[in-house]
Structure formats: C-alpha cells, structure tokens
Amino acid sequence: MSMHQEEKAVLKRARELEYPTDRLGPTGLMTQASHINSSRMIMLASQLGHMVSIKDPETPLIPTGFENKLAERAPMLYQSDADYEVVAKIAKNEYTYVIIGYDAKKRVYHAWKREEAEEHSEGFSTRYDNKFIDSLEIGDKIDTGEYVKKSTNFDKHMNYRYGKNINVVYLVAPFVYEDGILAMNGVEDMFNTFRSHTKRIKLADNEVLVNLYGDSDHYQGIPKIGEKTKKGIVCAIRKTDSASAPRSLKSDKLRQIERSDRICYGSGRVIDIEILTNKDPRKMPDTGANRMVKELYLQQQEYYRELYHYMNDIAERADDEGYTYTDEFSIIAAEARDYIDAATFFADTSDTVYGTTEIVIHLLDEEQMIVGSKFVG
C-alpha cells in the first residue's frame, strides 16, 4: 500500500468515528511516555475513568499538553457559534433559567439553559462555572467563541484542571507502607468533591408533610430552593386517617417526627424542585400542611407556560419571517411543552400514570475526603 493510499485509509476511518473523543481520548493525551514506565501508564489510564471533579482545582505546575487539548473535546463546554444578542431571559429560580439569543446576521435563534451542576453516576457531579451566563441581561452581546457556560474544571485559558499542586515526600517510614503517600498538612481539606442527589417523594391524598422547616407562624414541610437540609433529613411524611387525625395533626405534633412517619434522607443545598402531578390544581390543598406543594406547582407551571409560549411564538413565525432556530432551541421548547400540555400525563418507570403527587428535590452537597477515599499522586 502506497503512502497516498495509507493516508486515504486513515482519513476514511477517522470520518467514520462518531465522536471527536473516539479519535484521541484522555488516556492518550494525559501521559508523557518518555517519563513513565508501561505499568504506571496502564494504571494511570485505568484511573482516569474514576476521577471525580474537586472544588477549586489547580492547573498543574508541570503540564502535559493534555490540559489544554481536552477543551476541544469536553462535553461540558458550551461555546457560542455565532454573535448573539440576548432577547429574553426567563427564570424559574436563581439556579435554573433559560437565555434566548438571536443572531441577526445568520437570522438564527438559540437557547441556553442555566444549570448549577451535572449529575454523574453514584451521585458524583461537576459544577458549572456560570459567571458569564449569570451576568447576561436582555440586550447584552454574546460573541462568537465565547464560553457561555463551562465546567469549573477549566481555568480562564481553558486548561483542564483535575487536581491540586501539593507537597509530598518520599521516605522510609510506616506512614508510606505499600501505596501510602505522605503529604503536606491540610490536604484532607483541599480535595472536597460535589455530590448531586435527586430525591423523589410520593405524596398521597391522605398524607401530609411534617413541619420540619417551619415554626409556629408558618408551615414548611420541605426546604426552599437555596436552603440546606437539616440533620440529613429532606422531609418526613405522615399518613393520616379519621382515627389518628385529632392527635397526629396537632400543630405541636406536626413539628416532631414520629416512629410511624416515612422519612426521606439527604444532605445538601436545594437547587431545584419539581412537582409532578396529574391532578387539577384547583383540587390541590390550598391550606394547611401541603399548601407549599401547590404554590410550588403553580410557580413551576407559570414558568414553563411563559417559556413555551415565548419560544413557540418564535417557531410559528419562522417560515413567514425567514429565520430559523437551533436544535437546542427546539429541545428546550419541547421540554417546556411536556409540563403544560393537557394531553401529557406523568408516569413512573413502569409507565403507570401517577395517582399521587411526586415532589422531586435536587440537592447539591459538598463532601470532604474521608477514610477510604482514594487519593492518587
């Protein structure tokens, strides 16, 4: 096979690869082969898949080239492909909202959804650096190449940061027996990670939320958005009936957890709440223990209704006015429609239509290193 034919064969295989990371993965970029033996390279390659994002990572003092190259292939980077002007900002809460931009030159609408973090397997998560998107207001410009949002693992030069620069020492001592590493003081506080947890709470018609987050003046069964859970408890649910109601629904009893209560455990700060129900909101409790659930549901529906109507109006006028919109714009509009479409019914994983109300609480927690955490240097 000639060199020309070999090049054609290589290019053909490259074009058949679906994702950019299929061509060159992090294990191929990370190591400097001339400075590491084969066993260590294999070990490091296997460990890369188990790395978790840490709080405030640092750029390595001795880079490999991997750190900057990865930015071209990272999935948690949202780079503007055109010059957009912000035409709308529709918010659900301080952690979740949608920015809509318009490129007058190409006549294209695009949308970005602001998210606090992305949840991975086993509850580990990566936070987004939302400084730029949080600064945007209607009328602001988004230039081509601007990173609208990105993982906090990247610095301002778009170098991927996956660890910390710490002082270690190699010596003969019981502390470093086998694979032990003797490191500087304070290391245990430098490698905090973030954990995301999604808690799903079913609430039947004969159940109420215990008043764990309220007081004698107001009733609050779950933490509000931005608040932290108390003592590792998200909420407690109490089943009521005509026989037990006179005692179990007294105000002082509703501020205490009883043995028969169903408890939802979880730690962290609430970054979003969803209320999933097929009930007519007019029939949802408007007073008492579950009033907050109805209020959250009405606020949620108003957000999705405003978002969908705005985006749908743009979509309906696209052909007549000669502009278009991106796939991401369509996806966000479709998600909003699912919440307000009267023909849509929420169902569980077995496709059983909800007969109850489900409260979905998204938590973000900061976790310290503990005994048993794997630390690689």
Report the location of each language-model feature.
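Long, charge-dense accessory insertions within large macromolecular proteins
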Residues: 1-376
